Design a protein with these regions (language model features):
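Surface-exposed polar/charged interaction patches
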Residues: 14, 18, 27-31, 115, ...
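N-terminal alpha-helical "arm" segments
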Residues: 1-52, 383-397
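Extended, solvent-exposed, turn-rich assembly/linker loops in the middle of proteins
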Residues: 166-281
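Contiguous N-terminal and early-domain "leader" segments and peripheral loops that mark the onset or edge
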Residues: 38-59, 135-138, 142-172, 177, ...
Length: 397
């Protein structure tokens, strides 16, 4: 009877079903053909961990941790790392396959040999690999989406407790958007003065349509941007905006010019199709596009389980800043810059490249814990190249 010894690398081999690790990873290219990084295009990878911002003119599944390039995933923050330096931070994450996870299957293979490798068992091993690879690739793309949304909606990228609870903290990368491009509404001019966006909490002097219209006029006349303008905001803020009574009144009077009673036109506007409301709003404020962003990320952070025991918990974090509106050029506004991570010390068949080498996925054995680690590493950064044509308004609380 064949009783060849079985180790955890056999899990990888059985799960691959005859493919190499690289061939297995290549399968995900078709799945992840959609990515929310519009306005940013990939550059060729660099040799060092720095980004360059060439400013041009116009006639703009859980997140991995950002860590020092030489540190393992989820490394503690390094105090000497400074933000605003043009450095591209490294992200790492891993899944662990251990003998507890597949103990029964491995014991059966150990006793009986390859004849025990059923299709069901192979699918189980494949599922473990798929969960790991799919999770790491998805995290890589989610991280780029998170970067893009935060940079567009805040003008900066901050690595801190909310989006990187187990890694570096207190790092802000500034992309040189001029300070006078930031607008903050105050007092009763804020669209809502409390975080519950209901009519009772509307700022008494708030007029969202006039605010946006004046902002666009300022961008055109003061800052001399003559191209097409896209207005971006969080989906929740857009939904709330379409309930603001001042907005409904203005849109209602535009749709029903013969009706003079405010309460009637507000009621009529509330019953209108959302696409029609958006079209009227866009026409009134004179922007070319309005893009609500229904986008969130998730992070793993130390916490407690349902029994109060220490555990990792998953927490949702916003991608697009919910209190802000961004005004940016339509089209490309930046590039994604980064390096191809080094994989020195790994056997060639334990390394796979994804997205042109921007993401590396490796297999590493740890005999002490009887585990195989499926690890990812990437160092990419969305870099705006038109900061002089990016504008951000904070309109509410």
């Amino acid at each position: 009877m064949n009783t060849l010894p079985i180790d955890l690398y056999k899990v990888i081999e059985y799960g691959l079903g005859g493919d190499t690790w690289q061939e297995f990873i290549d399968r995900y290219k078709e799945k992840y053909d959609l990515l929310q990084i519009d306005g940013f295009e990939f550059e060729a990878t660099k040799l060092d961990y720095t980004f360059s911002q060439l400013i041009t003119s116009l006639g703009v599944k859980t997140l991995p941790a950002y860590v020092d390039p030489e540190s393992p995933g989820y490394e503690a923050a390094l105090g000497e790392l400074e933000g605003r330096t043009g450095n591209i931070p490294t992200q790492k994450k891993f899944y662990r396959l251990n003998r507890v996870t597949v103990r029964q299957q491995l014991q059966l293979l150990q006793r009986v040999g390859m004849s025990a490798l059923t299709e069901e068992m192979q699918n189980l091993f494949l599922g473990l690999l798929d969960e790991s690879a799919d999770g790491l690739i998805g995290s890589y793309y989610n991280a780029l989406t998170h970067q893009r949304m935060r940079i567009v909606s805040t003008g900066k990228f901050t690595i801190d407790t909310d989006n990187n609870p187990r890694g570096l903290k207190g790092i802000t990368i500034d992309f040189n958007i001029p300070e006078n491009h930031y607008q903050v509404l105050a007092g009763t001019s804020r669209w809502w003065t409390k975080d519950e966006h209901i009519p009772a909490n509307q700022g008494s002097a708030s007029d969202p349509i006039m605010d946006v219209k004046n902002r666009v006029k300022e961008i055109r006349r003061k800052y001399h941007y003559l191209g097409k303008i896209r207005m971006e905001l969080a989906q929740d803020l857009w939904d709330d905006l379409m309930t603001h009574t001042t907005v409904l009144k203005r849109i209602g009077h535009s749709l029903y010019p013969t009706v003079t009673d405010d309460s009637t036109v507000i009621a009529n506007a509330q019953n209108e199709d959302e696409d029609r409301l958006k079209a009227i709003f866009k026409k009134l404020v004179k922007v070319d596009e309005i893009v609500p962003r229904d986008s969130y990320a998730f992070v793993d952070k130390p916490g407690k389980d349902a029994d109060g025991q220490p555990d990792l918990i998953t927490e949702q974090v916003e991608n697009f800043k919910a209190t802000n509106i961004a005004f940016i050029p339509v089209g490309q506004i930046g590039t994604i810059q980064g390096v191809e991570p080094l994989t020195l010390g790994y056997e060639a068949n334990k390394v796979a490249s994804y997205d042109g080498g921007r993401l590396k996925l490796t297999q590493r054995a740890n005999p002490e814990t009887h585990s195989i680690y499926i690890e990812s590493e990437a160092a990419q950064m969305c870099v705006p190249r038109m900061p002089q044509y990016m504008f951000i308004s904070t309109v509410t609380v």
